[in-house]
Amino acid sequence: MAASRNFRISYISSPEVKFLTSIVTRFNPRTTKLVLRFLGQNETEPTTNQTYGSLLTNLTLIKRFAQVILVPKSYIWPVGSDLYLQPSTSLVVDAHKAGLEVFASDFANDKDLAYNYSFDPVQEYLQFVDNGLFAVDGVLSDHPITPSAAFDCLFNLGKNPTQVTPLIISYEGASGDYPGCTDLAYQKAVSDGADIIDCPVQMTSDGIPICLGSINLLDRTSVAQLRFTNLTTTIPVLQSGAGVFTFSLTWDEIQRLKRNVQAPCNAAYLAANQGLSVTDAVMDVLNKSRINTQRTKKILIESSDSAVLKLFKARSNRHELVYEVDENIRDALDSTIADISEFANSVIIGKESVFPRSSAFLGDQTDVVEKLHAFKLPVYVQFFDNEFVSQPWDFFSDPYVEINSYVNGADVNGVITSYPATASKYRSKFIYLVTL
């Protein structure tokens, strides 16, 4: 009370009815709003001896001593034990009819979200204000930068926003939402706004090229549950452990497997040791594809093996050849970059080649992107995920802050992501004024 004599206080909140009723006559609601903060639905409010859940049945009583109710977000959009959203309650609509504002609490970027949000905290905030049914009047968040940007930039975003950089390249389709390299993952990546749909090419024993994110079927399929485990082998040049590799099974056998939720680096090995030419197989598919005749369609061919890219370059200059640097680097010699520019049109590097990290925090930015740009090589960065555990703490557990740091901070040309929808939203209308 003493502080209110010297400072303007906009809100005073309390979980106790007695406290709010004792001060309601001392404040002008036009300058200071009283907020009843709800705790868990089964917890007891000490003044009325009712649970907070039962208090919601008497909103007119609350209106006598408060102008706002602050409720956990689960009061509005409950989440089931399966971590999927349940139908919304009528709380916001009912409270507005009673003349009360509604603030939602318990928002944090580094907590588990309902699967409906694809681990994107912005989607969660928008669910509370842009759902076609109701809109809360405010949110209480541990990471205020995220709702601030979401409401300012993405609220009521149309279907045809202005498109700018970066180029959005999927990682095994929308593999954050569906098992990678499946029709569902690719269809969602397209609908989510990806510019380039990736296909990590692996070869079957009968010479059929397939899209699969790993040459080891144990990594991406249910092969361990079937009779093919007798085909387990160890090939140190491919990986340290044992595996069941795609070139050990026919296409017909692989089609019987189920994909699991979870980079083509094997072309040279397949050609030298298995007699399978990825280059020939890919070129054959491209030559037969309608995409190859559509000049407006962009095709990128990626490899971490310079010899493979040189073979593609000798076969056709129609496509963009992308060299993948398959390890994190802090620097690059001009002579090395000059060599790369002889057989590649662009380069893929890892996120830590731009912003090194240590103990989950960022180090100083490298000049790798700047050096590659000096040789007119576009730079694409991999891999971007929405899950907060994949991001350094400097990004506030916000995937948009992370993307922005690479696009505006490091001037990369494209992002490779398991969640194309997030990158598409960022590109459409997102503006983050964050200096790292």
Whereabouts are the PLM-identified features?
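Phosphate-group recognition and catalysis centered on beta-loop-alpha active-site segments
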Residues: 1-436
